[in-house]
């Protein structure tokens, strides 16, 4: 279904950015400003960062701004009162703005479970989805892919790895194996004993990508890569055993596909998230993009390692949840969001992250119901249980 993408005609595309103040959102704005003849930021939304969304709105002059935190509504409204910009607040408003008739593309770049319902609303409104919120497919992959097929909506991946896989696809040629690359995170060379004592500051020092705090911690535990495995299963319709995680510290190969004849096709480049963002907006066209270029002569070596699930059990838990199916990935995601925040707030140690997730997987009732109601209730139960374990 992700190839159902005959959406880009010659008119300027109006983009709704869910999460304009985050890492993906700010880089998407850079892409839009580089190609202001092709794209327009029609809607900007933020959860809490009123100051940044105000400055973005004053610069980009969108039609609509939404601040999800209702306590910040008056601050945003008053700061933009001299401009003809509609300002709304609250989670419900996020689901409403994506349905605006003038919106062509919804960039789903909110972090976490909060991105699920606005993405569903956008699919039902038949908007093209540029998907950066991986939790949407982790939590509700079955539901999302079913809705995308039903409403004939294209889903274009924005994750660097999934964009790489998407760029390597050959319609009509089956995927034998997906090679999902991973930098290995800041603790790649740590022993099991050393990992027991790492701090949030150690974890936030990611070696390659500039990301928000939540995803940086997930990258340190390899849960981020586990989520990407689940995401790849739904985006590309492959079985879990067809997805192989490959540790590639240089982050030059962003991912690859092996075809049935054994040929491997990879996408290479410098680590710049603007490229997958722009490609999701412009597909099937490629547009100029300013910035660094990959210089093959400067590469000393490209190395590859197997992931160690003894030292990084979160990757194993993600695979287990995918094999079990049903609401198990939803349970893992909910518990992970709780422990991720607790670790960032210095309330738990690093080893507790995987331990609490695993205990939550064992405790919360399993269900094969793929309705939104089931996912909402599972998410609530799993969060509450994980919080009690902290």
Question: Which sequence ranges carry the predicted segments?
Answer:
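N-terminal amphipathic/basic-hydrophobic helices that include classical n-h-c signal peptides
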Residues: 1-10
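Catalytic, metal-anchored helix/loop core of enzyme active sites in primary metabolism
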Residues: 11-390
